[in-house]
């Protein structure tokens, strides 16, 4: 499936059914971004979101939502495809702050958090992960919440949603680099 849809599914998709959950305000945008047939969709009662059924997602379903992690095939894809994967992740479970344009990806699945960090590193983006007890409506859920923070600039395509893109900031030349750069790639000799 497309990297964008795969990323969105990792964040807001049903692990065992070919479905994703989309915020009501994003329905039209997400429909245009996913690039796959939506066989049906319906509004969730009182949740402010819709469920999209996308048959092509059957190819990536797992036994439990706890089994979600970015596949090596996607982590080793082209740079353009990895950016699209990040966009799907950020459009589903990420946010870009208004103050410093800091991006945050949030999940309760540790191996997904670790694979998101690997994706960011592969794009040259420094990041940091913290964990804290997860709560819902102020009540502990018994799970751990993993937050991955990184800084983004207006020349980095971390989201496709206009409400998130508008929060990115212009890159300042005289600041410490927020990236790692590759100097050389050499084959291993066995």
Outline where the language-model segments fall.
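Intein-associated homing endonuclease modules of the LAGLIDADG/DOD-type, together
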Residues: 1-137, 147, 174-190
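C-terminal polymerase-core module
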Residues: 141-145
